[in-house]
Amino acid sequence: ADIVTTDVWTSMGDEQENEERKKIFKSYQVNMNLMSKAKKDAIFLHCLPAHRGEEIDDIILDSDFSAVWQQAHNRLYSSMALIEFLLSDQD
């Protein structure tokens, strides 16, 4: 894999399912074992907020694999451009 990505296991509003989902998805955590199966120069992405120790291991989130902070930074500018486009006078 060139890119490894994940999201939170429990969405906002579904907190009552959190403990059950942790049990079900534990084997899908992005950690060094999983990243070792990806390409040497693979990157890790996450839409944030991340739950450290659940869907993502601390080591990966803070590693050279992680492009999470750049992804978040880019999302800011993508959102700004979309808002400008939607609010602009379209002919």
Tell where the protein language model's regions lie, with residue ranges:
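C-terminal helix-to-coil terminal segments
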Residues: D62-D91
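Rossmann-like adenosine-cofactor binding region
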Residues: A1-I59
